[in-house]
């Protein structure tokens, strides 16, 4: 089976490396090089770099026009495998592949159709999520389910953590799906009545209100890592929150909302909220390295009693 691989994200790199061991990858479709770093020099994504290193033809157009369709048609692929690309495919593009098109989606479809399933699961405080290998349809993330595997989300897991987990789980699931397809399996239709949807996070998604519950705040902190990251102020200085947990207790009702009320070397830096205690686990001062809460506490002047304020 000749495969046309489509991705623009590092989350798909392990899948790509595994697929080329077992199948002929006749081409790769990815996004164009983008400016990166202080110098804003054009930089390839890791999928493009890996494909070039393996002498696999790469297409990186701005738009999927007729010229791109003809280039893909000339490669004579059997199947398209998509994992985090960022563009919508029209019917004439999907029709190029006689054995169909499949997609790796990091949720338990039909839950969280859309572009931010990992972040949405964490933002909503889900304890379980998963990976779905689905056939592709014109309606986004509505195709038949070929393979599905669930996993637990720990209370302190970030979007970055779950992305790494999805990356490690996906190669074997894709191989399983391709084996099923080779045997004529068409997949199991989704229950569209149970579908939920998610959209892009925005920069302002990193704003928090300490009047919310500790559960809601820690979900936002963890969901927004690695982007856009939650920023607050402490003594007129910006502080970035990278990881948090929470306690469902109200021990400090008389203290100010957002106040640092305690330090526990086993649990975290305690912050009072509208309901419960926020446990800060990893923080950063802009331009400096990310610190665990112990290093942040030991490297700061008296923190207990200081108050975090929201950035609006």
Swiss-Prot record:
The keyword Protein biosynthesis applies. It catalyses: L-methionyl-tRNA(fMet) + (6R)-10-formyltetrahydrofolate = N-formyl-L-methionyl-tRNA(fMet) + (6S)-5,6,7,8-tetrahydrofolate + H(+). GO terms for molecular function: methionyl-tRNA formyltransferase activity. (6S)-5,6,7,8-tetrahydrofolate binds at residues 107-110. Pfam families: Formyl_trans_C, Formyl_trans_N. Its EC number is 2.1.2.9. InterPro entries: Fmt (IPR005794), Formyl_trans_C (IPR005793), Formyl_trans_C_sf (IPR037022), Formyl_transf_N (IPR002376), Formyl_transf_N_sf (IPR036477), Formyl_transferase-like_C_sf (IPR011034), Met-tRNA-FMT_C (IPR044135), Met-tRNA-FMT_N (IPR041711). CDD domains: FMT_core_Met-tRNA-FMT_N (cd08646), Met_tRNA_FMT_C (cd08704). One of its GO terms (cellular component) is cytosol. Keywords: Protein biosynthesis, Transferase. It is an enzyme of class 2 (transferase). It comes from the Bacteria. Belongs to the Fmt family. Attaches a formyl group to the free amino group of methionyl-tRNA(fMet). The formyl group appears to play a dual role in the initiator identity of N-formylmethionyl-tRNA by promoting its recognition by IF2 and preventing the misappropriation of this tRNA by the elongation apparatus. This is Methionyl-tRNA formyltransferase. It comes from Borreliella burgdorferi (strain ATCC 35210 / DSM 4680 / CIP 102532 / B31) (Borrelia burgdorferi).
């Amino acid at each position: 089976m000749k495969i046309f691989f489509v991705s623009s994200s590092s989350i798909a790199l392990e899948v790509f490396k595994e697929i080329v061991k077992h199948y002929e990858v006749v081409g790769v479709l990815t996004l164009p090089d983008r400016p990166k770093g202080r110098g804003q020099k054009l930089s390839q994504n890791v999928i493009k770099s890996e494909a070039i290193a393996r002498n696999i033809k790469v297409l990186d157009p701005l738009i999927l026009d007729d010229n791109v369709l003809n280039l893909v048609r000339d490669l004579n692929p059997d199947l398209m495998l998509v994992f985090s690309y960022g563009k919508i495919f029209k019917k004439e593009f999907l029709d190029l592949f006689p054995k169909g098109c499949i997609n790796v989606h990091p949720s338990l479809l039909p839950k969280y159709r859309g572009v931010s399933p990992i972040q949405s699961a964490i933002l909503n405080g889900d304890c379980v999520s998963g990976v779905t290998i689905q056939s592709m349809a014109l309606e986004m993330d509505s195709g038949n389910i070929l393979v599905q595997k669930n996993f637990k989300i720990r209370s302190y897991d970030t979007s970055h953590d779950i992305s790494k987990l999805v990356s490690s789980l996906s190669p074997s699931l894709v191989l399983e799906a391709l084996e099923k397809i080779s045997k004529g399996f068409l997949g199991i239709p989704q229950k569209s009545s149970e579908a939920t949807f998610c959209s892009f996070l925005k920069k302002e998604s990193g704003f928090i209100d300490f009047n919310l519950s500790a559960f809601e705040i820690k979900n936002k902190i963890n969901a927004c890592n690695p982007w856009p990251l939650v920023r607050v102020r402490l003594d007129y200085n910006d502080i970035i929150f990278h990881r948090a947990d929470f306690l469902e207790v109200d021990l400090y009702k008389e203290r100010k909302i957002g106040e640092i009320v305690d330090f526990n070397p086993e649990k975290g830096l305690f912050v009072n909220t509208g309901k419960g205690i926020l446990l800060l686990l990893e923080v950063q001062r802009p331009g400096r390295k990310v610190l665990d809460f112990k290093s942040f506490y030991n490297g700061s002047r008296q923190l207990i009693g200081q108050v975090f304020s929201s950035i609006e």
